[in-house]
Amino acid sequence: MTKYKCERTYIDSNIDRSCKRDRYWKMIGKFLAMTALGSLLLTGCGAKVDVPDMSSMGTINVVSREEGSGTKTEFDNLVGTDATGTNTVADSTDKVISEVASDKNAIGYIAYSAENNSGVKALDVDGVAPDAASIEKDKYPLCRDYILVYNGELSAVAKDFMAYVKSAGQAVVADYCVPVKKSETFLSDKSGGTVEIHGSTSAAPIVSKLAEEYMKINPAAKILVTESDSTQGLNDALQGRCDLGMSSRSLQPYESELLTSYVFGCDAIAVIVNSENTLSDISVDMLKKIYDKKYTAWSDLR
């Protein structure tokens, strides 16, 4: 992805071999130091997490998204879990929020841009809060991108919409998550027609707002946004059932080969608990143990 406001780290493949050797031994030294330090911490990685007394809490209700969800795929990959500890499967962001808000023992995950404080709260992860600054600098451990994809050539109106997303539309993206570039002036060519967009429930609110604002500029266009999940959206784009697919997960190699993609925003996966839960911070290691069914009660975190 082009680096604008979202920062990612890349490795230069042309580094001199001697530099690589120096870096190797520095890394070994840091590893040994961190190994010694790690034994003093509550968690196996990240910053120290202070866990309050949770003896009054009960069995953890582990809430996951459904198979095919881009949020689930990214969460599982980033945490390194097989999610065998899942108790409740929710097939949308709203259902995750509803489940966690109604159960003080529940834990779940949603798009940071969707967190609305309605009976739930987002936890810090490894001491880092999910916010625009930590996402922009890629400091929060559970960052991910929002992607629009298409197969083959776009229609004139779809091209015009994409031009809007890449320019003035970035101001709309900024209201939800971190944009990938500064907003720029957009001049529509006023192409007419319909654009079908399918996929991620996490990306859908942003894309729906982009569509709404674009149609104000170009009344000849009709942009239809249908929510399903990232995998379905990608498959629909591959098979020609829509003009654009929305994904909140990274593309598989074969998807990247067959589809043209554009990252239009950077977001994070927020870990949420009931607002009555006294926990404020959690480590990636703890999340893995919860979702792997190694921690089944809140008291296991201490």
Question: Where is each model-derived feature located?
Answer:
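Exported/periplasmic ABC-transporter solute-binding proteins
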Residues: 45-302
